[in-house]
Amino acid sequence: MIKTKTTSLLCFLLTAVILMNPSSSSPTDNYIYAVCSPAKFSPSSGYETNLNSLLSSFVTSTAQTRYANFTVPTGKPEPTVTVYGIYQCRGDLDPTACSTCVSSAVAQVGALCSNSYSGFLQMENCLIRYDNKSFLGVQDKTLILNKCGQPMEFNDQDALTKASDVIGSLGTGDGSYRTGGNGNVQGVAQCSGDLSTSQCQDCLSDAIGRLKSDCGMAQGGYVYLSKCYARFSVGGSHARQTPGPNFGHEGEKGNKDDNGVGKTLAIIIGIVTLIILLVVFLAFVGKCCRKLQDEKWCK
């Protein structure tokens, strides 16, 4: 009896350790964020059929264009089964790179947003988004993600000036995809292709304003709103939406959050390890007791 209970408990604890220490080779490592609705559709429903059709259209269209929007089925909307969606690649990607990114996003979104009526997956080089309510052409400046790098040296006036110039140039540029550079400082901004010119400028102005006020004194930073983003880095490349190797460590808030999570996880794993060792020890003692059950100290 002791052996059975001990074995069961040991297996449970080992499973807990595995679940708390996920593999770093997860297939979703290269996405920046995912937003999924809590509302779920039923498997094998009409909505799922149309969603699968939409996602397939994303992949097949990347050879012709970096951006496209779809409504499935076409014609009069049917509230319970109609799905709206867009995909968009970074403005300077070639068709092959665009197709690779969108295909990867489509392959991942099913696991990240399983049976969700809406899903929004932002990758390094592209995004895909779908919903059961139309968001096409609708302005949305909701803040989704922002972060700043390490502060620059206060006496590095040259870098501060370059960063300010690059961020400013993103706001005065033309088009929905904008890049800027000054020496070793690079920046990029892009808005969703379904926005009008004025909506795009409005969204980018908000994102760039946040970037300048929050991260203007940092080695880099990024701001992602629902319909646009802006980022810059010192020593990085505008070809990357996320900071390059010289971006620096995360800001103070990010460090505190990450350190707290790390410490908590280390404590939990330490406690579980001690419990496992205790269980193994008790199992060993129990085995000895059964062998020596006629001994007085074990009766």
From Swiss-Prot:
The keyword Magnesium does not apply. InterPro entries: Cell2Cell_Antifungal (IPR051378), GNK2 (IPR002902), GNK2_sf (IPR038408). Disulfide bonds join C36-C113, C89-C98, C101-C126, C148-C215, C191-C200, C203-C228. Induction: By the Pseudomonas syringae pv. maculicola effector HopW1-1. By salicylic acid. It is found in: Cell membrane; Cell junction, Plasmodesma. Pfam families: Stress-antifung (PF01657). The chain crosses the membrane at residues 265-285. Disruption phenotype: No growth defects. Two-fold lower callose accumulation in plasmodesmata than wild type. More susceptible to infection by the plant pathogen Pseudomonas syringae pv. maculicola. Level of salicylic acid (SA) is comparable to wild type but plasmodesmata closure is impaired. However, overexpression leads to growth inhibition and chlorosis in seedling stage, with levels of SA fifteen-fold higher than wild type including all forms of SA, and probably triggering cell death. It is a single-pass type I membrane protein. Highly expressed in inflorescence nodes and rosette senescent leaves. Mostly expressed in cell wall junctions between leaf epidermal and mesophyl cells, and to a lesser extent at the cross walls between epidermal or cortex cells within the hypocotyl (at protein level). Low vascular expression in seedling and mature leaf, but high expression in senescing leaves (at protein level). Residues 1-25 form the signal peptide. Residues 265-285 are annotated as: Necessary and sufficient for plasmodesmal targeting. Residues 26-264 are extracellular. Its main location: membrane. It comes from the Eukaryota. One of its GO terms (biological process) is response to other organism. Residues 29-135, 137-237 form the Gnk2-homologous domain. GO terms for cellular component: plasma membrane; plasmodesma. Residues 286-299 are cytoplasmic. Keywords: Cell junction, Cell membrane, Disulfide bond, Host-virus interaction, Membrane, Plant defense, Repeat, Signal, Transmembrane, Transmembrane helix, Transport. PANTHER family: ANTIFUNGAL PROTEIN GINKBILOBIN-2-LIKE, PLASMODESMATA-LOCATED PROTEIN 5. Belongs to the cysteine-rich repeat secretory protein family. Plasmodesmata-located proteins (PDLD) subfamily. Monomer. Interacts with PDLP1. Modulates cell-to-cell trafficking. Has a positive role in innate immunity. Required for systemic acquired resistance (SAR) which is mediated by the signaling molecules azelaic acid (AzA), glycerol-3-phosphate (G3P), and salicylic acid (SA). Negative regulator of plasmodesmata permeability triggered by SA during immune responses, through regulation of callose deposition. Delays the trafficking of Tobacco Mosaic Virus (TMV) movement protein (MP). Required for symplastic signal transport. This is Plasmodesmata-located protein 5. It comes from Arabidopsis thaliana. The gene is PDLP5.
